[in-house]
């Protein structure tokens, strides 16, 4: 499979948000706005790219018995670095995403890709898998955030599109996340078939 096919696969065929239904905790909780969704997606993508590459490089020296703990330590190291960078340079994003940045450590997308792809493929292919799955996750979260922000606040990326009288508060609350995700998954399934 070519590197472009690996990226396309992560965005379309194995989209973590709409096809694999992985990472639902940050998907539902952080997508109250397009900016939050995009920020969480980019944060997860950066960790995914780095961990896929490193885990693929370490696969030949990692004993099977300690494989999962090694994966978690590598993931935790990159998440810690990411959290420090976000706290230092992007305090607004840090305030908006809060606890969900450290929770990237236990995000099943990252551990799943480490186990399913990075541990079995070359470092370069694993890097491209991280890019593809990360882009798929980022696009999914951003789309979900855009829908929720437009319907709930009448704006997108902070720019007002609709007057306040058309806002539906439900969509910026947790039930709105489930409803929006359900409709988007249904649309994706319809388009696939």
Region roles according to the model:
Residues 4-5, 125-193:
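C-terminal transmembrane helix-loop-helix hairpin of multi-pass membrane proteins
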Residues 7-18:
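N-terminal membrane topogenic signal
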Residues 22-28, 44-49, 76-83, 105-111, ...:
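Hydrophobic core segments of alpha-helical transmembrane domains in multi-pass membrane transport
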Residues 34-50, 70, 94-105, 175:
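Structural signature of hydrophobic alpha-helical transmembrane segments
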Residues 48-49, 53-85:
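A glycine-rich, hydrophobic loop/mini-helix early in the fold
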Residues 51-64, 111-121, 187-191:
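C-terminal ends of transmembrane helices
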Residues 62-75, 96-102, 126-129:
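Cytoplasmic-side transmembrane-helix entry/capping segments in multi-pass membrane proteins
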Residues 81-96:
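Transmembrane alpha-helix boundary signature
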